[in-house]
């Protein structure tokens, strides 16, 4: 997790998963 739920959500939407 990057620390921000919003960031994780964006990555998940892109298909990159949690970074």
Swiss-Prot record:
It comes from the Eukaryota. GO terms for biological process: adaptive immune response; blood coagulation; innate immune response. Changing residue 8 to G: In strain: Italian bred. Conversion of fibrinogen to fibrin is triggered by thrombin, which cleaves fibrinopeptides A and B from alpha and beta chains, and thus exposes the N-terminal polymerization sites responsible for the formation of the soft clot. The soft clot is converted into the hard clot by factor XIIIA which catalyzes the epsilon-(gamma-glutamyl)lysine cross-linking between gamma chains (stronger) and between alpha chains (weaker) of different monomers. Keywords: Adaptive immunity, Blood coagulation, Coiled coil, Disulfide bond, Hemostasis, Immunity, Innate immunity, Secreted. Signal peptide: none annotated. GO terms for cellular component: extracellular region. It is found in: Secreted. Heterohexamer; disulfide linked. Contains 2 sets of 3 non-identical chains (alpha, beta and gamma). The 2 heterotrimers are in head to head conformation with the N-termini in a small central domain. Cleaved by the protease thrombin to yield monomers which, together with fibrinogen beta (FGB) and fibrinogen gamma (FGG), polymerize to form an insoluble fibrin matrix. Fibrin has a major function in hemostasis as one of the primary components of blood clots. In addition, functions during the early stages of wound repair to stabilize the lesion and guide cell migration during re-epithelialization. Was originally thought to be essential for platelet aggregation, based on in vitro studies using anticoagulated blood. A long coiled coil structure formed by 3 polypeptide chains connects the central nodule to the C-terminal domains (distal nodules). The long C-terminal ends of the alpha chains fold back, contributing a fourth strand to the coiled coil structure. This is Fibrinogen alpha chain. It comes from Bubalus bubalis.
């Amino acid at each position: 997790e990057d620390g921000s739920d919003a960031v994780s959500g964006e990555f998940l939407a892109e298909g990159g998963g949690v970074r």
